[in-house]
Amino acid sequence: MARVKTGVVRRRRHKKVLKLARGFYSARHKHFRKAKEQLERSLVYAFRDRRAKKRDFRRLWIIRINAACRLNDISYSRFMNGLKKANIALDRKVLANLAMNDAAAFAAIVAEAKKAL
């Protein structure tokens, strides 16, 4: 059987990696080996941060809800307890959106939560 050299296959593989490494700094988007190393690392960061993003947004929503609650003279934890007792099933994303964009509606929800306590 004849020996097969990797010319075309290697070029395709290198082009694929270098295409994914566009925008990287210096040799990390020009040299295959450096690009491959950086690409592997960047995919690890992407995997990690897709999970961290969920935590970060939840923290942001809680901060916003807490700030709006304190304007309505109630703490975040008492507000969430009141919502649970009043059987109001709104998630933190929706509550934070209401707190930011519709203060009157949020105040009405706070009043219901206070009543349930």
Curated annotation (Swiss-Prot):
PROSITE patterns, sorted: RIBOSOMAL_L20
InterPro entries: Ribosomal_bL20, RIBOSOMAL_L20_CS, Ribosomal_protein_bL20_C
Organism, scientific name: Campylobacter fetus subsp. fetus (strain 82-40)
Primary gene name: rplT
Similarity section: Belongs to the bacterial ribosomal protein bL20 family.
Coiled-coil zones: none
Role: Binds directly to 23S ribosomal RNA and is necessary for the in vitro assembly process of the 50S ribosomal subunit. It is not involved in the protein synthesizing functions of that subunit.
GO biological process: ribosomal large subunit assembly; translation
Name by which UniProt lists this protein: Large ribosomal subunit protein bL20
Cellular component aspect of the GO annotation: ribonucleoprotein complex; ribosome
Keywords: Ribonucleoprotein, Ribosomal protein, RNA-binding, rRNA-binding
GO molecular-function term, one example from the UniProt record: rRNA binding
